[in-house]
Curated annotation (Swiss-Prot):
The keyword Lipid biosynthesis applies. Catalyzes the reversible formation of acyl-phosphate (acyl-PO(4)) from acyl-[acyl-carrier-protein] (acyl-ACP). This enzyme utilizes acyl-ACP as fatty acyl donor, but not acyl-CoA. Homodimer. Probably interacts with PlsY. InterPro entries: FA_synthesis, Phospholipid_synth_PlsX-like. It is an enzyme of class 2 (transferase). It is found in: Cytoplasm. This is Phosphate acyltransferase. GO terms for molecular function: phosphate:acyl-[acyl carrier protein] acyltransferase activity. Its EC number is 2.3.1.274.
Length: 370
């Protein structure tokens, strides 16, 4: 039985989404249990409360506070110690749940998760990983998507190791290919850090720690050239939000053109099956649920504006991660890559080596997680 702790108060909409999605998820997953964490009086007022309370595989866990989307990391971490977000993560720490899911403030979630669960041995910084649709009809996993704006080559190696474990667990690809996001495929392209990262990833591939494809460009993300794309959080966040903007623009453009006049509306009816398939294939809601990798517990982030369908997808992704032992897979891959990680740390300048394990929570940036 897989038990998931759900921050029922998180997200832009809160219980109206999380409770409906939770009920649908329970109906689709007979071997799953949910701990719904939230303010009892708010949850009790919801129309689905009675069904969920009566459900044999659902339990309400009380939390007196809520982390809002506008709360600073300091407020979320130091003042709201009984928030639904923190209590949900505590369920993982205490062993009552295998994974936590929240649609709340991304920066606060990362800060609280890191404070409560701590990072895995051998990992300096947690990273945010999510999926983007590709031309192969599958998905490309990408990290980091915003947790770390400044990275060393060692961090990118850690991301590659953790991301490979994620893809192996979620997509069931034993040896996922890894691409390093760059401005060109050639090894001579990019800045010094990217070149060093390329050499480090190649060494990791030679030692069997990862399956390194080489450098990839931005268009390769959507071609599906590799199963996993690794980059720093600044680049990843820009790429993610650019793709979101482009997708919305294309959707709005198609809708406007088919609504132009009676003839185009008739054409839309004829083209409906194709348009419907197109929309489904590129529906970002299907890929909702980003993993916070590198922690001593599993945490997944849902998009704050997720609807019921999207939040259910995030629950399903968290369920798959727990069922396929993602945390143990990450630990095993880190242990296997430990000699290379230690060697990479030893090669860092003294000041970088000292600073590597520490990341101020203020450097965590908010990013949508699809």
């Amino acid at each position: 039985m897989i038990r998931i702790a759900v921050d029922a108060m998180g997200g832009d909409i809160g219980p109206d989404v999380t409770l409906a999605a939770s009920l649908a998820f329970l109906q689709a997953h007979p071997d799953a249990e949910l701990l719904l964490v939230g303010q009892p009086e708010v949850l009790a007022a919801h129309s689905l409360h009675a069904q969920l309370v009566a459900h044999a595989r659902c339990e309400i866990v009380a939390a007196s506070e809520v982390v809002t989307m506008d709360d600073s990391i300091e407020i979320a971490l130091r003042r709201k110690k009984n928030s639904s977000m923190r209590v949900a993560i505590n369920q993982v720490k205490e062993g009552r749940a295998q994974v936590a899911v929240s649609g709340g403030n991304t920066g606060a979630l990362m800060a609280i998760a890191r404070y409560v669960l701590k990072t895995l041995e051998g990992i300096d910084r947690p990273a945010i990983a999510s999926q983007l649709p590709n031309a192969r009809g599958k998905a490309t996993t990408m990290l980091d998507l915003g947790a770390n704006v400044d990275c060393t080559e060692e961090h990118l190696l850690q991301f590659a190791v953790m991301g490979s474990a994620l893809v192996a667990a979620i997509a069931e690809i034993p040896s996922p290919t890894v691409g390093l996001l760059n401005i060109g495929e050639e090894a001579i392209k990019g800045g010094d850090m990217i070149k060093k990262a390329g050499r480090l990833l190649r060494a990791a591939s030679d030692s069997g720690d990862i399956n390194f494809y080489g450098n990839v460009e931005g268009n390769d993300i959507f071609k599906g050239t590799t199963d996993l794309v690794v980059c720093d959080g600044f680049v990843g966040n820009v790429a993610l939000k650019s793709s979101e903007g482009l997708a919305h623009m294309i959707g709005d453009y198609i809708k406007a053109e088919f609504s132009r006049n009676l003839l185009t509306k008739m054409a839309a009816l004829v083209a409906y099956p194709v348009l419907s398939a197109f929309k489904k294939r590129f529906d970002h809601r299907r890929y909702n649920g980003a993993a916070l990798l590198g922690l001593r517990g599993l945490v997944f982030k849902s998009h704050g504006s997720a609807d019921v369908f999207a939040f259910e997808q995030a629950l399903s992704r968290a369920y798959d991660a727990a069922r396929n032992n993602l945390l143990e897979r990450v630990r095993e891959r880190i242990a296997h890559a430990a000699p290379l990680l230690v060697a990479a740390r030893a090669a860092l300048p003294a000041e970088e080596a000292l600073a590597a394990p520490f990341m101020s929570v203020e450097s965590t940036v908010s990013t949508p997680a699809h």
